[in-house]
Amino acid sequence: MKSLTAYLVLFMLMVNVSFAQQIEPTFEKQNDLVKATYYYENGTIKEVGFFKDDKLHKQWISYNKEGKIKVVAIYDNGVKNGKWYIVGEDHVKEVTYKSNKIIKVEEVDESEVSFI
């Protein structure tokens, strides 16, 4: 009986460790930028974007666990600038930033957004 209990405990530990494993992000140098890709535990891409001088730069795209786009964001040397798109279940919000400040928020038709 003790050995059965020991095997069950060992099995439970192995299951917990396997679920707790994280997939390491990847970083790829592209000229003066570094492309970063982050992953969910299930292996699907969570986020892709660029760094310049250790600051968020250019386009960043966040995905849900099913691989659908959640957010498209634009940074300029770590500063939120330009149009961001936040994708909901039945709508898309367009948020315009200038120097980290929200300038405008509006709902847009999905057909007007090319990445969906």
Regions found by a protein language model. Give the residues of each.
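Glycine/tyrosine- and acidic-biased, solvent-exposed loop/turn segments at the edges of beta-strands
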Residues: N16-I116
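Bacterial Sec-dependent N-terminal signal peptides
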Residues: M1-P25
